[in-house]
Amino acid sequence: MSAVDYGREALDFIEGLGVYRKVPDAMNALEAAFGRFGFETIIVTGLPNPDQRFAQMVLAKRWPAGWFNLYTQNNYDRFDPVVRLCRQSVNPFEWSEAPYDAELEPSAAEVMNRAGDFRMSRGFIVPIHGLTGYEAAVSLGGVHLDLNPRSKPALHLMAMYGFDHIRRLLEPTPYPSTRLTPREREVISWASQGKSAWEIGEILHITQRTAEEHLATAARKLGAVNRTHAVALAIRHKIINP
């Protein structure tokens, strides 16, 4: 598919997810949407602190029961190189990009190898870092995946909005004020087209720093944790037209 086709897939997903008011129904929608990219497993979860258990952080999942039991009983999250990189990265990445030394870190190698036993030999994870320090992720796994430079931005957007929707279903809170200024709507609109803060500044004849400030303010008003999340929410609330 072209970048436009992937973008349309993401927008259709965002526009349709709002009708689901129960977590199982929303997860069915996520499963169907990500399934079109070849993914067979999904987990939406917080990342535990040292004094927390992984199982208590999970918001929703479509994992094989055997893998979830194995993962939690062996505390694999303590050794998982994907979780480790997720804490350090703000950008989504393929599981294979998470570094580890198989000889020095046999537990990390065990996690990655055993995942393959459950048709999770490849994957893609979207880190989520909240303004208050909350760490979470949407992790997708499978075997034959449609992962390329055109599909990844769409998956990023879909995962961010999917996380937000699941979280709000579990913890209903009023949406923050979405009264953006015309300039804030402009910068979010350009951001939705993949423009960087520098490029937005050039287009609008403002400095890069000013563009970044407008993006940050818009994200805060929308209750977003980052720029991609802000774009997803702005589209969902019809503040901008993609």
Swiss-Prot record:
Signal peptide: none
Keywords: Activator, DNA-binding, Quorum sensing, Transcription, Transcription regulation
HTH luxR-type domain segment(s): 173-238
Binding region for DNA: 197-216
Single GO molecular function: DNA binding
Pfam families: Autoind_bind (PF03472), GerE (PF00196)
UniProt record similarity statement: Belongs to the autoinducer-regulated transcriptional regulatory protein family.
Name this protein carries in UniProt: Transcriptional activator protein BjaR1
Taxonomic lineage from the root: Bacteria, Pseudomonadati, Pseudomonadota, Alphaproteobacteria, Hyphomicrobiales
Gene it is expressed from: bjaR1
